[in-house]
């Protein structure tokens, strides 16, 4: 099971698509003491992987202390970072604290395009420098890419790039228009474009030696099955089943792109929230509406619950409209 803690709202970039609308520090952020107590509750709940994200998690002064505490509880600490703040010293301290892998964002092989998307000139160069620092420290890293219409044709090239520089994984995030992302909703791929890209990604995954995983596009499990391409992933959308997020202020939600509150760690221990929250209990019924509820791939895909909520007035159990198979739009097997 995986939990992601958005450790801070503070960030040194101004990314167009940021789901958290990160920029400045939020005065309500969990303190070091609160964070450590929550980490112990996460371990008690049976979670294995803890993602430190943000904002930019490396902007927290106590980040090394928190990572070390997570590792001491038997958790596997990993990161979601823009990579620009990773120096040799930072990489060494992360490794010593027990960090297992750094998820670093690269949205284009064209530095100018990446920088424009990330809102800061020079971000691409700083990110690549951060990757090199990880390599020198012996710290595993993976590449994260957000898909929009202008980089769609680069995605498989970025996978090749990720493999060439020694990444262990390429995680490909399909844009969900929340946070600042709602202002660039028009850059999201259309339904059939989603389907075509998923086919390209799964074919590429079969060619390369590194792990490749689409995120926020749970239909990839169906696509892989239809193409006869084996994948180690047995479930598409994990929200509330084996995954959740905790906001910088302690609010627990099923995923980073959903606004439904499942609880507050300042009011109730995390392990109790995970076990008893009505939001999580409803998600675990898998009683989906519309096409998702009738789909023969429901058990492995589950539809994107965040998209269901966004496009169906908050009903996170509704159908995922971004599925070509469900809408019988010329997709194989539909």
Predicted regions span which residues?
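Short, basic/aromatic recognition patches
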Residues: 226-235
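Iron-sulfur (Fe-S) cluster-binding segments and ferredoxin-like electron-carrier domains
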Residues: 20-28, 259-262, 298-332
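Radical SAM/AdoMet-radical enzyme domain recognition
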Residues: 3, 18, 29-56, 60-176, ...
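Short Fe-S-cluster ligation motifs
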Residues: 42-54, 320-334
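C-terminal accessory region of radical SAM enzymes
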Residues: 192-226, 251-309
């Amino acid at each position: 099971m995986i939990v992601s803690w958005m450790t801070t709202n503070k960030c040194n970039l101004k990314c167009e698509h940021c789901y958290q609308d990160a920029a400045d520090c939020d005065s309500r952020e969990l303190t070091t003491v609160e964070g450590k107590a929550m980490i112990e509750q996460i371990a008690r709940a049976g979670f294995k992987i803890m993602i430190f994200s943000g904002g930019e998690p490396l902007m927290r002064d106590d980040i090394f202390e928190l990572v070390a505490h997570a590792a001491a509880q038997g958790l596997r600490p990993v990161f979601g970072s823009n990579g620009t703040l990773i120096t040799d010293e930072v990489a060494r301290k992360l490794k010593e604290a027990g960090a297992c892998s750094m998820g670093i964002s690269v949205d284009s092989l064209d530095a100018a395009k990446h920088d424009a998307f990330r809102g800061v000139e020079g971000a691409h160069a700083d990110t690549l420098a951060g990757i090199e620092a990880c390599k020198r420290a012996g710290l595993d890293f993976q590449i994260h890419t957000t898909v929009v219409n202008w980089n769609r044709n680069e995605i498989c090239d970025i996978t090749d790039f990720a493999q060439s520089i020694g990444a262990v994984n390429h995680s490909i995030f399909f844009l969900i228009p929340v946070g600042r992302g709602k202002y660039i909703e028009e850059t999201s791929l259309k339904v059939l474009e989603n389907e075509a890209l998923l086919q390209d990604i799964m074919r590429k995954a079969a060619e390369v030696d590194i792990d490749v995983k689409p995120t926020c596009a749970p239909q990839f499990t169906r696509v892989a099955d239809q193409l006869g391409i084996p994948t180690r992933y047995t479930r598409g959308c994990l929200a509330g089943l084996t995954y959740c997020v905790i906001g910088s202020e302690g609010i627990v939600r099923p995923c980073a792109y959903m606004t439904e509150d499942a609880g507050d760690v300042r009011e109730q221990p995390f392990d109790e929230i995970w076990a008893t929250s009505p939001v999580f209990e409803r998600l675990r019924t898998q009683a989906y509406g519309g096409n998702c509820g009738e789909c023969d791939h429901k058990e492995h895909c589950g539809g994107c619950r965040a998209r269901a909520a966004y496009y169906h007035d908050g009903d996170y159990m509704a159908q995922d409209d971004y599925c070509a198979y469900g809408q019988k739009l010329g997709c194989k097997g539909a």
